[in-house]
């Protein structure tokens, strides 16, 4: 392995255009893998992770960091194909970046690149991505999503203020119910499944 400074100098020469070219090559490789699999329906998991750093590297900031609270870090947004266990795309952000920042744009890029390769895409995300802009991006392209909703007090109130929920047994020990509601500041109601 070369000295870290050599790698750092090499990576320092990358421009936005260079990194975008690398991301495009990655999409082409993933599409070949997807075409070879002949899958017509896929689940894409969107998530972020923290990369700890020591010192004051460019682009780092103090943010959510469960391993080393108060330490500077990067926050990396990534997308994986569940069926193929394969990385699709991602990018690194400053450590103090909110989880959902850039996710709608990344999802739009995924859709643009994979639209001709699969019939159905279901995007799966945790509550950090419970954002109407993300949902509108997915719905606008005609795809599906599963996003864990944040348990805001006003949403929980809406669950119990309206008509009683019709609960159905699920998985021998759980019950589920459906409700359509519009979270505050959202343009229209959405379907929620309560477990």
Predicted regions located by residue number:
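Short, conserved catalytic/metal-binding motifs centered on acidic residues
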Residues: 1-3, 7, 40-51, 85, ...
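Active-site-proximal, Lys/Arg-enriched surface segment
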Residues: 4-78
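Short coil/turn connectors at secondary-structure junctions
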Residues: 38-41, 74, 86, 117-119, ...
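Short, structured patches in soluble enzyme cores that scaffold and shape functional sites
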Residues: 48-50, 81, 89-94, 127, ...
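Short acidic, glycine/serine/threonine-rich loops at helix termini
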Residues: 54-59, 88-92, 132-138, 156-161
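Electropositive, glycine- and tryptophan-enriched low-complexity nucleic-acid-binding patches
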Residues: 66-116
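Domain-level cores of phosphate- or acyl-group-handling catalytic modules
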Residues: 97-154
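An anionic, glycine-rich sequence signature occurring as long contiguous blocks
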Residues: 144-195
